[in-house]
Amino acid sequence: MNEKKEFKPYIPADKVMPELTVTSVIIGVLLAILFGGANAYLGLRVGMTVSASIPAAVISMGIIRFILRRDSILENNMVQTIGSAGESVAAGAIFTLPALFMWAQEEGTAMPSLVEIALIALIGGFLGVLFMIPLRSALIVQEHGVLPYPEGQACAEVLVAGEEGGAKAGTVFAGLGIAAVYKFIADGLKVFPSEVDFTIKPYKGSAVGADVLPALLGVGYICGPKVSSYLLAGGSVAWFMIMPLIALFGGDNIIGPALIPVSQMSPSQIWSNYVRYIGAGAVAAGGILSLIKSLPLIVRTFKQALKGYGKKADGVESRLTKDIPMMFVVLGIGVLAIIMWLIPAIPVNLLSAIIIIIFGFFFATVSSRMVGLVGSSNNPVSGMAIATLLISSAILKATGAVGMKGMVAAISIGSVICIIAAIAGDTSQDLKTGYIVGATPYKQQAGELIGVAVSAITVGGVLYLLNAAWGYGSTELPAPQATLMKMVVEGVMGNSLPWSLVFAGVAIAIVVEILQIPVLPFAVGLYLPIYLSTPIMVGGLVRLYFDKKKGITEEERKTKVNQGILYSSGLIAGEGLVGILLAVFAIIPVGAATLGDAINISKIINLGNIGGLVFFACLVATLVAFINKKEKKTK
């Protein structure tokens, strides 16, 4: 207890600095749009998103301190608070909402409107922030030293080391620029294929390849060798064990859900017709298993949170203890419940809206404590979403809400809960950063609400754009989580799934759990095409080399690893931005074709698979070069 009372933030309570300013809001909003769009594209492509807090903080320092010549750590903290909200809204939205687009495509129903998507994202995002306001004291302040909030602490360290911000921001922008040019050459000009693949003729049913893209290299480096290897292990089991066995035993038989004989199928068709259902079962089981393993922690968290609900750290009211007033929080939650009840975008009655509020608060509490202990990347949001969808689908079916209407309602409810969990986790990391650097809580909470509002309005446009360009469930945008959530709802509502394949995936997940291997990354690798796992593994191997490199001090190792993380963040952002730009090109008509077709020069220059591998090797070399780059000390 003494340790908590004696904690002194970087900026003391009696010192007032610029914080929620016009500058911080404008830069934060721009970064929220940037990282929200980039993460939406990344998540729809590979089923993973990355935290935007640290790159947003670094870019902010580069702009505010070194371009605008202003010096306020709290202003920089506000920028990363607003900016990281974009990534979290995108993460919650892409897990579920693309299912509505896929149904519209398959069943001929109406597409969800931009207003409906914005309302779902706004309600989920606002609730996620509002739930965290009374929990801040209990989880962030009173549990300081108990809940580490790793990303929050890391971001605070970056902010405190602000004098290095200029050089670090340059690393992020370099990654962004290189990835943007690379992506444009690969998927815009199509000088070389971004997916290189090789069939193994003697080993029928199998194939190997890689999506040689910057974002995947960056994801692998940031996730590290362990997570990358689990993903590749899952992919290897699918593509080198399960698929060849299906090809061997399937023969000339037509086995549902496929409509042609197995012998006539390519490896991709075998994956699409059979393996993705096995993978879906494994991912669903992995999400639920992670939730079950967390149950003791969830119960303990809930008890402690209710006990300390809204309690101040001490009796003294100061700048550092001021939250948004509780009256505003309660009123806001009540208004959002009424809006859910009244708007057609979320087709629920008042009782269901109240149930969403109760479940939402429960999952917000769980999400916050989970990220506090194990970090945002290990937060079982997919498990919470699956649990919500199973419960809501079962309730809707029991009350007669079946067919497409019931399925849309289930996904809408699941979307709100998913966004609540994602935003609550992000908000708690940001509030921990603010607690360490000495930010004013109510200003940070207001910043989160601004970031959520902007991101909710823009995420619908991004989803529409990407769907119009390539369509969800395509090779370009497989939308793995949303496809899984769609399958879960269809399975409960219509019994339309090939359950034997799904349960085979569940069995694999249970075996993996018994072997004490983390189930979710393995299951995601099983579910996704192996082309995504291989470049991620390359990034993981680069990280492993520098994690284990001999002949350097621990301080040098930490510096090199962090430089790689910043450069990798730039790679992810750069590819995401050009991916969205190319989506715009794909729908702009030029004569009888599109602008995307007009810039395609593959008939003039096409370097083929070998060219793709050479370009990717050069990209890996740039990552290594930036990791080894000597840091310039700026004063």
Model regions: which residues?
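Alpha-helical multipass membrane-protein architecture
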Residues: M1-K635
